Amino acid sequence: MHKSDLREAIVGRGFFPSLILESVYSSLGDEAIAEFLVHYEPTFAHDSLGRHMTVLVLTPSRLLCCHTDEVADEARGISATSSVDSVPLRDLGAVTLTRVVNQRMRPDASQHPEMFAPHLVETWLTLGWRTTRRIDLEPAGCSDPACEADHGYTGVSSSEDMVIRMSPAADGQEEVERLVHFATQLQRRVR
């Protein structure tokens, strides 16, 4: 993989390419690119529609995760925020590739099970971090409805993760195949 391939993929999306290229290239430095994945998607928040792009770059020693979000502001118009996480491969936890298929049965498939033709509907890449955790807290309580005591907090600590979902219908078959290829290459490098 070359920087020119990554540049073409980012510029081709037309979503703040200068910002994203500068963010990724400054974090990448002189390191070689083993693989990359670019995912562009709409986002929904309350009553607004936005755009988000994730760029994952696998190097021999790190996984770079660039997240760029569109920010709509009536006073300033459209702007964007971009951040890059640099995760050493040794700190990457589980790398999960999930494939969802519909089983299409041919008319004579009952006699020949090999005649089932699975049809890929969507694919997910889930990355779990070993070093980052998310803590969700909420006020603790008791079963006495009249109790006014402070019971502190209760919560759950879970590993932070990231999920990228693609489907042939939304992203195209070629992008889904690229996701599968990227995920399998990453799985082979994480120990």
Walk through the language-model features, giving the residues of each:
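Anionic N-terminal interaction surfaces
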Residues: 1-62, 66-72
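Acidic, Ser/Thr- and proline-rich intrinsically disordered linker/docking segments
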Residues: 72-191
